[in-house]
Amino acid sequence: MKTTYVNATIVTMNEQNEVIENGYIIVENDKIIDVNSGEFASDFEVDEVIDMKGKWVLPGLVNTHTHVVMSLLRGIGDDMLLQPWLETRIWPLESQFTPELAVASTELGLLEMVKSGTTSFSDMFNPIGVDQDAIMETVSRSGMRAAVSRTLFSFGTQEDEKKAIEEAEKYVKRYYNESGMLTTMVAPHSPYTCSTELLEECARIAVENQTMVHIHLSETEREVRDIEAQYGKRPVEYVASCGLFKRPTVIAHGVVLNDNERAFLAEHDVRVAHNPNSNLKLGSGIANVKAMLEAGMKVGIATDSVASNNNLDMFEEMRIATLLQKGIHQDATALPVETALTLATKGAAEVIGMKQTGSLEVGKCADFITIDPSNKPHLQPADEVLSHLVYAASGKDISDVIINGKRVVWNGECKTLDEERIIFEASRYKRGLQR
């Protein structure tokens, strides 16, 4: 099946960050086979021609760190620091989860993400009360591209920890798929919730299965102080000593890093999922993304969960990410719009090991989203496309979402998930949680 999308303004995110006015994209099945300017007059015979009527077309956004199973916890535990928030609000509520509630919560998060322009994401879920196969089936049904990882903790007895490692290894062997729509990573929660032995076992599983690693790291000053007091090393050095960085690793946050750590992480291909809104809301601080990029680190933007954000809008994350860097460095050139867009598209895709997506180029997967600026005053005049995408647009502006060549959202309607049912069930299950 060959489909041509014509009469579009195409934000390619190629090496030149080229914007093509009055362009077209030809998709064959799941791949882009042509991106060009002007009237459609290709040598390719196509089955369908769709007039985009001047819409902006850009790569699908890539959320490098989230927790969609937590979506029912939106608005719970506001105005709290990370540790008490986790210990007194989030973990007690997660302990009440059932398989049915977890699926309902996941569906809500998926619906919000895909309708706001996210096409790919990397996720960590707490396995308590969760049917992991049902979660993976739900993500698959959404049509989204994802790395969904089972989180490991050292809670309970040594026997509990041993069982958690065994279950996580089975999960990795079952779901790791380097080139498929769904894959996974090895995901120890953090150095403050995992024993040394568990972290070493996670490193072993990642090496033996050639997977990536996903971990929360250097998120707060308290974490750095506590780990240094307990192990005599800062979190980066401690986790490295456990062997985790033998495989490409995504660290969520990286708020509290020094220059030596940034250089070390870049050398060891450790990437950062930058969660600006979550870090601000939890009072964790502001990650120095400018310094990370200057050190050669790969960085991708992320939302974290709705419980600490409180939405999954990647446009909002792009905007706050660039504004924060300009503010903390008192440098208006810090993190310009092209860089912010890169960190939410092709740069983010590289961070989570999905190089097949993130830009609109021949050979890439057909993952793209559209915005119609013609009826949106906040996107007018419509000629400064890149600026408007970062500083003015929001997830509510999305018209269409195509993932792997399939129309997942069309004219604002999600074709893969039942929006009315999902919203009804979310409210019903939320009422059942004992707060």
Swiss-Prot record:
Q: Please tell me where Zn(2+) binds in this chain.
A: 65, 67, 216, 304
Keyword Zinc listed? The answer is: yes
Gene3D superfamilies per the record?
Answer: Metal-dependent hydrolases, Urease, subunit C, domain 1
How many cofactors are bound and how? Answer: Binds 1 zinc ion per subunit.
Q: Which UniProt keywords apply?
A: Hydrolase, Metal-binding, Zinc
The EC number(s) given in the record are: 3.5.4.28, 3.5.4.31
Q: Which cofactor does it need?
A: Zn(2+)
Query: Using the chain's own numbering, where are the disulfide bonds?
Result: none
Q: Which NCBIfam families match?
A: PRK15493.1
Per its record, how is this protein called by name? 5-methylthioadenosine/S-adenosylhomocysteine deaminase
Source organism of the structure: Bacillus anthracis
Taxonomic lineage is: Bacteria, Bacillati, Bacillota, Bacilli, Bacillales
